[in-house]
């Protein structure tokens, strides 16, 4: 019997920006598995700028778990220019992520995220 993931990750590169769309459920160990897969996609594309569209993700880490996750795991995405696209109801995650030390910038409009990343010089 095949074990089907509760989430999906799709990606494409547009104008030098890796765009990743996460959908489905993110709970428990799924978050770490997704982060590892995301790292693999970033490495495979040699990306420096990433849009992470999480608007369709169900379930999130709480603020304490975000902090613990960042402190206990080292992922490539932590070193990149990242725009997170999310729904307005999840705006409090922007503060939690910033407090955990991640330099991600939050957007509710994907076109604004693209414009912001295009304005940034590559590292």
Language model features: what each stretch is:
Residues 2-123:
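Amphipathic, Lys/Arg-enriched alpha-helical "gate/interface" segment within cytosolic domains
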